Amino acid sequence: MYLTTKEKEKLMISVVAEIARKRQARGLKLNYPEAVAIITDAILEGARDGKLVKDLMSYGRTILKREDVMEGVPEMIEMVQVEATFLDGTKLVTVHNPIQ
């Protein structure tokens, strides 16, 4: 099976997000890479499901809460940008201050 660089990146995000979700389920607070991976993965999957860019921009701010992550992580993640594949092509989804 041949995967492009973008496909490998998406696969890596998915794997990190899955590990992070397992850690979160065990009650652990997420670190920076885990939080970004979960938000990014949710946006990628939402695009695949046919959701609109504007809806994903709003949804991206509801995925994680301040209490889900380690101290200082919300301030480190001012913005998450994801190049996602939608039904009508690839678009950039930007989520500002994703952790409230």
Curated annotation (Swiss-Prot):
<comment type="similarity">
    <text>Belongs to the urease gamma subunit family.</text>
</comment>
<keyword id="KW-0614">Plasmid</keyword>
<dbReference type="InterPro" id="IPR050069">
    <property type="entry name" value="Urease_subunit"/>
</dbReference>
<comment type="pathway">
    <text>Nitrogen metabolism; urea degradation; CO(2) and NH(3) from urea (urease route): step 1/1.</text>
</comment>
<dbReference type="Pfam" id="PF00547">
    <property type="entry name" value="Urease_gamma"/>
</dbReference>
<keyword id="KW-0378">Hydrolase</keyword>
<dbReference type="InterPro" id="IPR002026">
    <property type="entry name" value="Urease_gamma/gamma-beta_su"/>
</dbReference>
<dbReference type="InterPro" id="IPR012010">
    <property type="entry name" value="Urease_gamma"/>
</dbReference>
<comment type="subunit">
    <text>Heterotrimer of UreA (gamma), UreB (beta) and UreC (alpha) subunits. Three heterotrimers associate to form the active enzyme.</text>
</comment>
<dbReference type="InterPro" id="IPR036463">
    <property type="entry name" value="Urease_gamma_sf"/>
</dbReference>
<keyword id="KW-0963">Cytoplasm</keyword>
<dbReference type="GO" id="GO:0005737">
    <property type="term" value="C:cytoplasm"/>
</dbReference>
<dbReference type="GO" id="GO:0009039">
    <property type="term" value="F:urease activity"/>
</dbReference>
<dbReference type="GO" id="GO:0016151">
    <property type="term" value="F:nickel cation binding"/>
</dbReference>
<protein>
    <recommendedName>
        <fullName>Urease subunit gamma</fullName>
        <ecNumber>3.5.1.5</ecNumber>
    </recommendedName>
</protein>
<dbReference type="GO" id="GO:0043419">
    <property type="term" value="P:urea catabolic process"/>
</dbReference>
